[in-house]
């Protein structure tokens, strides 16, 4: 019997994996880690006696979740992406299934916060979960502030600097940092100095990133229209004004020098991957815009189904031809 952790390849996914590793280590369990993104195929073989944790991630299309659930002995899914949670609920309603996957799925918090809650509470009642989520360790809360965009409503939030501090680390180092953090927290160490040091590192790196991003945007950013094709029963496409950029390293902060909320609905970053697919990220600060829903529609309309994420940040995979020939129209062309 082997314990596996399948996790997303971003800060929230790495933090979730580190948290899970710390708690499993207290039980004498050393898990096998599988870093995933939506453009990757899970090719690993799982045994019928294995335990699988899927953290801050879901396999797409959703049938792959069902296939893995039916393969292994224990299947725990912890996620916070509203679009896929709603898809799961719709499948349950459509098929009339009364059972559900073990785990914790709740919008408004990050995967790391939910992972912390899951391992801390033997009774996973919603009341107990909400109570614990209000008292997560500071570093895990900062991950949530960043990943769910709560930081945008917090004056002088330290979440962006905290996230930036990990940009210089390998995935293994990030996972190890959070595993150590949680282990010491469980052993009642005071971690304030460690957290402050990490934030200060991030502040220094942010100064460099601001200058670098501003220079990058001068040659990479352009104004465009995003044409989102609705389901076939809807009357017409919806058109959004976007500031788009061809960029390998993404994040809404990269657009700081060119994003104008009074002109742009969405920030759109895209990159051609070595798989032959184009990964697209969407960001918005407008309350009336749901990037998760838009990403799902764009992904499903193209050659590769799937896509989604959060209201303020989401993504999908497509082809270069579909992105530049159908979805995105550069202003002036």
Which residue ranges define each predicted feature?
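Long, charge-rich alpha-helical interaction segments
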Residues: 172-209
């Amino acid at each position: 019997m082997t314990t596996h952790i399948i996790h997303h390849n971003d800060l929230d996914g790495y933090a979730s994996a580190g948290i899970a590793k710390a708690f499993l280590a207290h039980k004498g369990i050393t898990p096998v880690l599988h870093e995933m993104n939506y453009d990757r195929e899970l090719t690993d073989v799982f045994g019928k006696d294995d335990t699988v944790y899927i953290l801050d991630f879901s396999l797409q299309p959703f049938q792959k979740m069902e296939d893995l659930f039916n393969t292994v002995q224990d299947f725990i899914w912890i996620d916070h992406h509203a679009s896929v949670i709603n898809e799961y609920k719709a499948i349950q309603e459509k098929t009339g299934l009364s059972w559900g996957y073990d785990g914790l799925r709740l919008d408004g918090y990050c995967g790391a916060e939910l992972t912390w809650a899951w391992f801390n509470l033997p009774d996973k009642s919603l009341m107990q979960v909400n109570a614990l989520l209000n008292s997560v360790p500071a570093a895990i809360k900062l991950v949530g502030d960043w990943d769910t965009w709560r930081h945008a409503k917090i004056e002088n939030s330290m979440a962006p600097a905290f996230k930036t501090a990990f940009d210089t680390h390998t995935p293994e180092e990030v996972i190890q940092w959070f595993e150590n953090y949680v282990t010491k927290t469980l052993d009642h160490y005071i971690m304030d100095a460690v957290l402050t040091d990490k934030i200060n590192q991030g502040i220094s790196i942010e100064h460099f990133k601001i200058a670098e991003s501003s220079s990058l945007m001068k040659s990479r950013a352009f104004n465009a229209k995003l044409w989102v094709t609705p389901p076939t029963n809807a009357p017409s496409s919806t058109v959004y004004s976007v500031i788009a950029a061809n960029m390998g390293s993404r994040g809404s902060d990269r657009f700081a020098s060119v994003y104008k909320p009074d002109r742009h609905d969405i920030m759109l970053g895209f990159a051609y991957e070595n798989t032959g697919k184009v990964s697209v990220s969407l960001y918005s600060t407008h309350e009336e815009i749901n990037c998760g829903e838009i990403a799902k529609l764009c992904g499903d309309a193209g050659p590769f189904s799937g896509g989604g994420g959060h209201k303020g940040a989401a993504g999908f995979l497509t082809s270069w031809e579909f992105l530049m020939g159908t979805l995105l129209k550069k202003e002036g062309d």
